[in-house]
């Protein structure tokens, strides 16, 4: 038996089996003679953790036009969606936002010169609560999350190791991490693509083409986790680092790709029977990738998400 309930406790639980919300005459958390919290709830963990009605919105705008020598097309998009981890017990609710922009211009500068450009920008911001690994969090929530327990005590402290459960953390400590708003994670993505091309008609048989393309992608992970602070008795708080520690981590990832093409094309026909074509040019490509992880252990404040928040035990781990 994983529980420490007596026959009287089981009777108290049975009396509350139809209470979908806490009844004043049948409280879900009772303070025992030993000062410890004892739990007799009928708590709906599923809807308190998960957002079963996820709001999302999308807005699009585009403009196009032009004339004899110039044409353009511009478009923009905004998309937002609430995430799965967004129940009423979670303060830092999961959220996803996406902003995108694109523009294309074509211009006949002269009879012998044509220019075009194409630019796109895409930005993503995603945030989620709890431990670092969201998939493992969802898997762990299948264990030891019984309805008799609640996420918070009457004084607002977090429930993690209830006295009525034999030395086992609720949801392998994940419910406590989700209930603590200092556990938060963000993923920021920014992608920029720019293409320019120029064509010159130097002679009726000779053309010159040049293009420059750049593709830049940036991704930044920001992860803030805190040691679990919980209470199992009135006026008593405890701290454990069994599942996670006070850490702040950033992982910047970036790659940049440059491409330059330039070439001449000569094409000539004789008597509509003989054709000659020659192409000569050059290509230049440059690629750079940066992927680092900087992790700080020991934070001086639970309100500041920065490497500047330190204490006497702070140390860093850098991976490249």
Residue map of PLM features:
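Alpha-helical support elements that line or immediately flank enzyme active sites
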Residues: 58, 65, 195-200, 214-216
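Residue-level signature of outer-membrane beta-barrel architecture
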Residues: 65-67, 107-108, 198-204, 266-268
């Amino acid at each position: 038996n994983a529980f420490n309930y007596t026959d009287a406790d089981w009777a108290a639980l049975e009396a509350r089996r139809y209470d979908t919300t806490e009844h004043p005459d049948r409280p879900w958390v009772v303070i025992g003679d030993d000062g410890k919290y004892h739990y007799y709830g009928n708590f709906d963990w599923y809807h308190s953790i998960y957002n079963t009605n996820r709001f999302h919105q999308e807005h699009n705008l585009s403009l196009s036009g032009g004339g004899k020598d110039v044409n353009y097309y511009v478009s923009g998009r905004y998309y937002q969606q609430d995430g799965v981890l967004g129940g009423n017990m979670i303060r830092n609710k999961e959220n996803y936002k996406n902003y995108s922009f694109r523009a294309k211009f074509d211009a006949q500068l002269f009879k012998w010169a044509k220019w075009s450009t194409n630019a796109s920008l895409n930005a993503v911001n995603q945030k989620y609560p709890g431990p670092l690994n969201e998939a493992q969090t969802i898997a762990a929530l299948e264990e030891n999350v019984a309805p008799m327990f609640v996420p918070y005590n009457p004084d607002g402290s977090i429930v993690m190791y209830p006295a009525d459960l034999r030395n086992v953390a609720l949801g392998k400590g994940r419910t406590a991490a989700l209930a603590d708003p200092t556990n938060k994670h963000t993923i920021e993505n920014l992608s920029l693509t720019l293409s320019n091309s120029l064509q010159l008609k130097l002679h009726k048989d000779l053309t010159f083409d040049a293009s420059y393309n750049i593709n830049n992608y940036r991704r930044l992970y920001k992860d803030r986790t805190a040691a679990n602070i919980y209470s199992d008795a009135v006026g008593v708080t405890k701290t454990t680092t069994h599942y996670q520690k006070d850490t702040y981590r950033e992982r910047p990832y970036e790659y940049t790709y440059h491409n330059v093409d330039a070439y001449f094309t000569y094409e000539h026909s004789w008597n509509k029977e003989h054709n000659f074509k020659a192409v000569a040019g050059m290509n230049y490509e440059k690629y750079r990738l940066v992927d680092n992880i900087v992790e700080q252990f020991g934070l001086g404040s639970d309100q500041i998400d920065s490497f500047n928040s330190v204490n006497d035990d702070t140390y860093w781990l850098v991976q490249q």
